[in-house]
């Protein structure tokens, strides 16, 4: 089960990482992955009709971060147009917000590898 907030909503954070697109604010929930067809691999995350969510663009966007995560982990230099990456990520987040059940809060956060400051803090997607 996802993190239960005082208002009864579950909090999901979009923050790309290696083989993950986001996480719950609850420590006992594993990070969220996504199948190559764009299906979100978590039965507790559902759309307005209670059905699983499929977003191929979320999968493609998340996969872009993987070479940077690897480079960062071994101390190799990397380059990324963070402004563009985050604009596309926010566009995806807003699209997800439109189809995501109102049982969820949706947040967007920059990955730890991003030192640009483009996204300086976790942002609520409304």
What is the predicted role of each segment?
Residues 1-126:
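Intrinsic low-complexity, intrinsically disordered or marginally ordered coil/linker segments
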């Amino acid at each position: 089960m996802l993190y239960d907030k005082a208002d009864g909503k579950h909090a999901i954070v979009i923050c790309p990482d290696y083989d993950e697109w986001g996480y719950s604010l609850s420590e006992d929930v594993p990070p969220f992955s996504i199948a190559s067809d764009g299906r979100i691999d978590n039965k507790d995350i559902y759309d307005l009709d209670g059905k699983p969510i499929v977003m191929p663009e979320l999968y493609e966007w998340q996969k872009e971060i993987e070479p940077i995560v690897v480079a960062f982990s071994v101390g190799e230099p990397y380059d990324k147009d963070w402004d563009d990456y985050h604009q596309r990520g926010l566009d995806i987040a807003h699209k997800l917000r439109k189809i995501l059940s109102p049982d969820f809060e949706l947040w967007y956060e920059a990955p730890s590898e991003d030192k640009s400051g483009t996204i300086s803090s976790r942002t609520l997607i409304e």
